[in-house]
A protein has these predicted regions:
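Extracytoplasmic "Venus flytrap"
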Residues: 43-62, 66, 75-88, 92, ...
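Hydrophobic alpha-helical
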Residues: 103-120, 193, 209-276
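Flexible loop/hinge segments that line or gate small-molecule binding clefts
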Residues: 109, 113-150, 173, 271-277, ...
Length: 335
C-alpha cells in the first residue's frame, strides 16, 4: 500500500544545522536571502523530477518563487527523470547539511537507503507531489500533494458526464495514455479510474489499449498514433496528463478524426495549453491537479524546521472542468 494513504500525524525533532555550504555541481543554483535580525535563514534542498511537462515547469517555478518570497536559501536540482540523479542530489544536500530536504520522487520505490542517510544526519525529508513506498514510515515527515487515486476516480466520473453530453450510445472503447512507468501519478490515476469503471461500468466500458506516454507531448503523439493503427475503433481517450493529450490530438487529427467528437478526451492537470485545447473543442473535460505547491511547501518546511507537528499528508485543493467552462476559466489560469 502506498504511504500517501497513511493519515497519521508525526512530530519531528530537527537538529540545528551548521554553516551553509556551497552548492553542489548538480544543483542549478541557490536563491533566497536571510530575512533580517541576524537570524539564520532556512536552507532547503529540493530535487525536482524534471521538466517533462507544462505542469512540471509551473511546479518548479512555484517552488522557486515561494522560497524567494519566504527568504529561504533554495538549492534546486533537476533530475531529468532519472532516479539516480535524485539520489545523488539528496546525498549532496546531506553533505551540505541543509535544514530540510524536499523532493518529488521519479518513481515509488528504491528510496530507503538514501532516506536512511538523511535520517541519520537528522535532516527531515518532505515529499512533494508524489509518494514513495518505504520499509520505515519515519523516513519522511509528510507529503504535500494531490490525491492521485481520487483524480483517477474524478476522471471516470467526469467521463460519465462527457458521454451523456455527447449523447453517446453503445460500447465505450477507451485508450489510456499512462504516465511514467512506476511513478505514483501513473499507478494511482489508473487505479482510481478502474475502480469507478469496474464498480459502475463493467459491462459497457473497456480499456482496449493502455501504454505509457511518459507524461510528454512527444510520447502522447507517438503512442496515440500506434493506438489508432492497432485499435481504429477507439472512441474515448483517458490521458494521465494534458501534455500527452495534446500530443495525442495531433495523431488523432492526422488520422482524419476529430478530437473531442470522434474520440472524446478526458485528461488530468489543467495547464493553460490544455484549457486552450478544451476551448477549441478538442478536449472534453479536465481534472485539475494543482502544481502551485510552493507556498504550502514553504509553510511546511518552516514548521518542520521549528519542530512543529504536521499532518502526514497535506492535500491540495483542486477542481474539475467541462468543455463549456473552458473559455471563461482560461484567462485566470496561472500555469
Amino acid at each position: 500500500m502506498l504511504n500517501r494513504r497513511n493519515f497519521l500525524t508525526a512530530a519531528v525533532g530537527v537538529a540545528a544545522a551548521g554553516g551553509l555550504a556551497a552548492c553542489a555541481k548538480k544543483d542549478e543554483g541557490a536563491s533566497g536571502s536571510s530575512s533580517g535580525g541576524g537570524s539564520k535563514t532556512i536552507t532547503l534542498g529540493f530535487s525536482q523530477v524534471g521538466s517533462e511537462s507544462g505542469w512540471r515547469t509551473a511546479n518548479s517555478q512555484s517552488v522557486k518563487d515561494a522560497a524567494k518570497e519566504a527568504g529561504y536559501t533554495l538549492k534546486f536540482s533537476d533530475a531529468q527523470q532519472k532516479q539516480e540523479n535524485q539520489i545523488s542530489a539528496i546525498r549532496s544536500y546531506i553533505a551540505q547539511k541543509v535544514d530540510v530536504i524536499a523532493f518529488s520522487p521519479v518513481v515509488v520505490t528504491g528510496w530507503d537507503a538514501v532516506l536512511k542517510e538523511a535520517k541519520a544526519a537528522k535532516i527531515p525529508v518532505v515529499l512533494t507531489d508524489r509518494s514513495v513506498e518505504t520499509s520505515d514510515e519515519s523516513l519522511y515527515v509528510t507529503l504535500v500533494g494531490s490525491d492521485f487515486t481520487d483524480e483517477g476516480r474524478r476522471a471516470a466520473k467526469i467521463l460519465e458526464k462527457v458521454l451523456e453530453k455527447a449523447g453517446h450510445k453503445g460500447a465505450v472503447k477507451i485508450a489510456q495514455l499512462e504516465g511514467t512507468t512506476g511513478a505514483a501519478p501513473a499507478i494511482e490515476r489508473a487505479k482510481g479510474f478502474k475502480e469507478v469503471m469496474d464498480a459502475s461500468h463493467k459491462d459497457d466500458w473497456k480499456i482496449v489499449v493502455s501504454q505509457t506516454g511518459d507524461f510528454t507531448r512527444a510520447g502522447g503523439k507517438q503512442v496515440m498514433a500506434a493506438f489508432l493503427q492497432s485499435n481504429p475503433d477507439i472512441n474515448v481517450l483517458f490521458a494521465h496528463n494534458d501534455d500527452m493529450a495534446i500530443g495525442a490530438i495531433q495523431s488523432i487529427e492526422a488520422a482524419g478524426k476529430k478530437p473531442g467528437k470522434d474520440i472524446l478526451i478526458v485528461s488530468i492537470d489543467g495547464v493553460k495549453d490544455g484549457f486552450v485545447a478544451m476551448s477549441e473543442g478538442k478536449i472534453n473535460a479536465i481534472v485539475e491537479c494543482n502544481p502551485l505547491l510552493g507556498p504550502q511547501l514553504m509553510d511546511v518546511v518552516k514548521k518542520v524546521k521549528d519542530g512543529e507537528t504536521v499532518e502526514r499528508w497535506i492535500k491540495t485543493e483542486e477542481s474539475d472542468f467541462m468543455q463549456d467552462q473552458a473559455a471563461a476559466a482560461l484567462p485566470d489560469r496561472k500555469y
